[in-house]
Amino acid sequence: MFETITPLFPGLPGGPELLVVLLIVVLLFGANKIPKLARSSGQAIGEFQRGREEIEDELQDMTGDDDEDDATSESSADSVSTDSVSTESSN
């Protein structure tokens, strides 16, 4: 049964293949530019994550505001009805 299931990523390179890819990268870009490329790639990933978090926060605020507004209006209505009951009982 499990022999027929194909892996999610069938062509991921292993140890020797990664060494060949690393050698090609060094030959293409040179050893001096690799740290700069790694640094800029890390910064790009960080900016992408910050942007994603900002969008997630905005979406939560948008969906959360509706729920909070409903809860606030309900609690306001409860306090108004409680105040009116206490005022009527004082008279």
From Swiss-Prot:
Q: What is a biological process (GO) this protein takes part in?
A: protein transport by the Tat complex
Got a GO cellular component term for this one?
Answer: TAT protein transport complex
Q: Which domain of life is it from?
A: Archaea
> Predominant location of this chain?
membrane
MF annotations from Gene Ontology: protein transmembrane transporter activity
The record's listing under Gene3D superfamilies reads: 1.20.5.3310
Instruction: Please give the start and end residues of each transmembrane region.
Output: 9-29
Biased composition (Acidic residues) is annotated at: 54-72
Entry keyword annotation includes Nucleotidyltransferase: no
Q: Is Membrane there in the keyword field?
A: yes
What does the UniProt function comment say about this protein? Part of the twin-arginine translocation (Tat) system that transports large folded proteins containing a characteristic twin-arginine motif in their signal peptide across membranes. TatA could form the protein-conducting channel of the Tat system.
Q: What else is known?
A: H.volcanii possesses two TatA translocases: TatAo and TatAt. Each may interact with specific Tat substrates.
NCBIfam families of this UniProt entry?
tatAE (TIGR01411)
The entry assigns this protein to a family as follows: Belongs to the TatA/E family.
The entry describes its oligomerization and partners as: Forms a complex with TatC. Cytoplasmic and membrane-bound TatA form high-molecular-weight complexes.
The entry's protein name is Sec-independent protein translocase protein TatAt
Instruction: Record the organism.
Output: Haloferax volcanii (strain ATCC 29605 / DSM 3757 / JCM 8879 / NBRC 14742 / NCIMB 2012 / VKM B-1768 / DS2)
Recite the lineage of the species. Answer: Archaea, Methanobacteriati, Methanobacteriota, Stenosarchaea group, Halobacteria
UniProt gene name:
tatAt
